[in-house]
A protein has these predicted regions:
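Short amphipathic alpha-helices in soluble, non-transmembrane regions
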Residues: 147-153, 180-189
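A common structural junction motif
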Residues: 46-49, 154-159, 186-194
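Active-site beta-strand/loop microenvironment that shapes enzyme catalytic pockets
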Residues: 78-123
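C-terminal regulatory domains involved in ligand/effector binding and gene-expression control
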Residues: 1-73, 178, 183, 194-212
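Short amphipathic alpha-helix segments
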Residues: 138-156
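Short glycine-/aliphatic-rich beta-strand segments at the starts of folded cytosolic domains
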Residues: 125-143
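Terminal, non-globular segments
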Residues: 171-174, 178
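Positively charged, aromatic-enriched nucleic acid-contacting surfaces
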Residues: 61, 71-88, 163-165
Length: 212
């Protein structure tokens, strides 16, 4: 399967400029119905706000956005660009604006809606959905850190570490990295340790350092 990126969880932000408050929300969604339910909930919660601008982007290529009364092109599209730059899909962003009495101009609105969306996505984090190889390797304590580093270098994640007479590292690796990891473990341990495949799984795994 092809990998893709989604928000890890719901994320929120607040951006203030000249007394206008911009409240950002980013959530993972899997359909237009889910996205529109989020929009409806935000409009209900912030019914007294001047604007509830939104955008969503789905894996099937569906893109929708609304400036909700702001000047055309100053809200929905800049928010959508945040998702595009991050390579994120199956995601919705709603930015609610409480007007502070001072006009921000086109440039100010572009900056505000972009910042609110980017900060909310950074708070949500980004996960990669792909097929992973689940594996285990038992190693002497002295080689634990090098093995852990090898997992990270190949784009994998350590899910669990078990401590006994030896250290057992339970990891998820991109399926195409399995052979390379096995070779690195053999080299690191001079052939004393081997990788044990446990199976394959499709799941979302948070990316390290995914804050924007």
């Amino acid at each position: 399967m092809d990998s893709y990126r989604i928000p890890t969880k719901s994320g929120a932000s607040e951006y203030v400029d000249k007394r206008s408050r911009f409240l950002g929300l980013v959530q993972p969604v899997s359909s237009e119905d889910e996205a529109r339910a989020v929009i409806a909930a935000c409009k209900k919660q912030y019914h007294d706000a001047r604007h509830n601008c939104w955008c969503y982007l789905l894996r099937d290529g569906t893109e929708r956005y609304s400036d909700d009364g702001e000047p055309q092109g100053t809200a929905g599209i800049p928010m959508l660009e945040v998702f595009r730059r991050a390579g994120v899909t199956n995601a919705i962003c709603v930015v609610t604006r409480y007007f502070g009495g001072v006009l921000l101009g086109t440039g100010g609105l572009l900056r505000a809606y972009t910042a609110a969306a980017a900060d909310a996505l950074a708070d949500a984090g980004i996960s990669e959905v792909r097929r992973w190889l689940a594996c285990e390797v038992s190693t002497p304590y002295a080689l634990y850190e090098p093995v852990r580093a090898a997992v990270a270098a190949l784009g994998g994640v350590v899910q669990e570490t078990q401590y006994a007479a030896a250290v057992t590292v339970c990891a998820l690796l991109p399926e195409e990295a399995g052979e390379a990891f096995a070779a690195q473990v053999r080299d690191l341990t001079a052939g004393r340790c081997a990788v044990r495949p446990v199976g394959e799984t499709e799941r979302a795994v948070p990316l390290a350092g995914s804050g924007l």
